[in-house]
Amino acid sequence: MAQSVPPGDIQTQPGTKIVFNAPYDDKHTYRIKVINSSARRIGYGIKTTNMKRLGVDPPCGVLDPKEAVLLAVSCDAFAFGQEDTNNDRITVEWTNTPDGAAKQFRREWFQGDGMVRRKNLPIEYNP
């Protein structure tokens, strides 16, 4: 069963952080790539620490081994310097899909006792 094997690695491009540059009076969109570098199909979900300011499209999906997806990370307009941005980040969560499951994302994959891995990508805002 897929859930007894820990999920393999993913890669993200960029690898360590996402950077948005001023001015912040307009919506910015930044593309990131998530690559399933493991030998198993995975389900992934993206979380943000600031739902008002940050959005991700698509927020979840399924990737076959070696498959990649391009995500659009958007930052809505905000008053730079007047809001706390220190803890802003995007978290990629992923888990192996059950053997024989259709290639359609299911939230319950993350709610059972299977192992879920996480990768944090901090957001940096340049003035």
From Swiss-Prot:
Residues 9-126 form the MSP domain. It comes from the Eukaryota. Its main location: other. Pfam families: Motile_Sperm (PF00635). Disulfide bonds: none annotated. PANTHER family: MAJOR SPERM PROTEIN, MSP DOMAIN-CONTAINING PROTEIN-RELATED. This is Major sperm protein 63. It comes from Caenorhabditis elegans.
